[in-house]
């Protein structure tokens, strides 16, 4: 058999990689002497962004503003835009992070980086409660504070009936919106699961 092409290609690959490994080994040895480890020369060093917490949704601008400490927020005529969000280095994520539990996904607004950060923890928990409280619940409280109709007559009773119908209609609309969001979320999770299994197959 003719082993010459195989040996030649192996030697070529070995000698091409040798200078880089020699330089890398020299840098690691000098870094070890100084007590500082430098990053490999092939990847440029980028500072990691300091994050107070991780938002469950980047559409929640208040959460993003609270969690990302080093973003410069620029006011534009249309909206407030985070400047410098792109190009940040990401650490590798586990499969557990890609497919969060349904209970934690619905319940938690964000996850704090440090467990002892009480302000962050209160923000994430308060955000969950604020989102759960709807305008319908506020209007129910307002209607309970209304005047009793015993002295005011039929007009007051009619007005309360109309407001009751409006509240029931608002409740039906909010329930249908919640149901449509649940369906969309389930479809997105199903698509994500199919995409992950498809990527693993190839």
Swiss-Prot record:
What GO cellular component entries does it have? basal part of cell; extracellular space; rough endoplasmic reticulum lumen; Weibel-Palade body
Residue spans making up a coiled coil are none
- Give the stretches traversing the membrane: none
Q: Where is this site: Cleavage?
A: 73-74
Main subcellular localization, coarse class?
Answer: secreted
Q: Where is this region: Endothelin-like?
A: 110-124
GO biological process terms, alphabetically, are: adenylate cyclase-inhibiting G protein-coupled receptor signaling pathway; artery smooth muscle contraction; axon extension; axon guidance; axonogenesis involved in innervation; blood vessel morphogenesis; body fluid secretion; branching involved in blood vessel morphogenesis
Where are the disulfide bridges?
A: 53-67, 55-63
Q: Which positions make up the signal peptide? A: 1-25
Tell me where it resides.
Answer: Secreted
- Name the InterPro entries on file: Endothelin (IPR020475), Endothelin_toxin_CS (IPR019764), Endothln-like_toxin (IPR001928)
GO molecular function terms listed in the Swiss-Prot or TrEMBL record: cytokine activity; endothelin A receptor binding; endothelin B receptor binding; hormone activity; receptor ligand activity; signaling receptor binding
User: Which Pfam family is one of those matched by this entry?
Assistant: Endothelin
Q: What induces it?
A: Induced by intermittent hypoxia in the lung. Induced by chronic hypoxia in the intrapulmonary arteries.
Report residue numbers covered by any propeptide: 26-50, 74-202
Known function: Endothelins are endothelium-derived vasoconstrictor peptides. Probable ligand for G-protein coupled receptors EDNRA and EDNRB which activates PTK2B, BCAR1, BCAR3 and, GTPases RAP1 and RHOA cascade in glomerular mesangial cells. Also binds the DEAR/FBXW7-AS1 receptor. Promotes mesenteric arterial wall remodeling via activation of ROCK signaling and subsequent colocalization of NFATC3 with F-actin filaments. NFATC3 then translocates to the nucleus where it subsequently promotes the transcription of the smooth muscle hypertrophy and differentiation marker ACTA2.
The UniProt family comment states: Belongs to the endothelin/sarafotoxin family.
Entry protein name: Endothelin-1
Give the source species. Mus musculus
